[in-house]
């Protein structure tokens, strides 16, 4: 099975081979133009509208009716008071992953109350709460296994990026020892949120 993660701007490019893709993950933090521009979610000055996104998803489903649609939302200082659940319900998505913005460098992330305000507001507005998965800051640290273009495992922490030696030079087992990776936290990322209060 293969999956693709995209910001949605060129989603139509997936359609010709959508029949061979099991899941498409789309990064959507807001449907407000101003919010998307502030956080840099734009392409050549243009943001993706809800209607445009709905049309592109419908076209992909025409090619592959069984394809799973996942939305990834990073809660940040510009969108934490927005409600996306009502519009996402119209898209009939299969999974909605809500992530808390991680501190990185000079960016301190968001306060816990901002993250939980977003969760609470969208939980009660959601028509499919069983499709919601959440990741707070602690859950995100060291729980992703990422590879850079030059073949290095890497992680991020408050100070920036940490890299292993390239996989072309060392065995996978040795490279993993050079970064922080928590396999149990990785598994916990896929737990289903059954209740939020």
Tell where the protein language model's regions lie, with residue ranges.
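Radical SAM/AdoMet-radical enzyme domain recognition
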Residues: 1-98
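Flexible glycine/acidic-rich beta-alpha junction loops that bind and position SAM and/or redox cofactors
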Residues: 37, 95-115, 138-141, 145
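Generic recognition of short, well-ordered alpha-helical interface segments
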Residues: 48, 55, 110-117, 148
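Short acidic, glycine/proline-enriched helix-loop-strand junctions
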Residues: 69, 104-133
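Anionic-ligand binding region
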Residues: 83-91, 98-101, 112-118, 122-123
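Accessory C-terminal segments flanking Radical SAM cores
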Residues: 103-104, 126-197
């Amino acid at each position: 099975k293969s999956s693709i993660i995209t910001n949605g701007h060129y989603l139509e490019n997936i359609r010709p081979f959508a029949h061979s893709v099991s899941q498409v993950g789309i990064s959507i933090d807001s449907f407000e133009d101003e919010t998307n521009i502030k956080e840099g979610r734009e392409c050549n000055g243009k943001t993706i509208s809800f209607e445009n996104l709905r049309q592109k998803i419908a076209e992909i489903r025409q090619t592959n009716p069984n394809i799973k649609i996942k939305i990834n939302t990073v809660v940040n200082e510009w969108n934490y008071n927005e409600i996306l659940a009502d519009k996402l319900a119209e898209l009939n998505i299969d999974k909605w992953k809500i992530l808390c913005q991680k501190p990185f460098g000079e960016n301190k992330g968001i306060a816990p109350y901002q993250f939980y305000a977003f969760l609470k507001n969208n939980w009660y507005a959601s028509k499919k709460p069983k499709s919601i998965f959440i990741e707070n800051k602690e859950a995100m640290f060291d729980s992703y296994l990422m590879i850079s273009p030059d073949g290095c495992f890497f992680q991020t922490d408050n100070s920036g990026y940490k890299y292993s030696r390239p996989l072309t030079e060392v065995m996978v087992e040795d490279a993993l020892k050079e970064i922080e990776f928590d396999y149990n936290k990785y598994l916990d990322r896929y737990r289903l949120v059954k209740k939020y209060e």
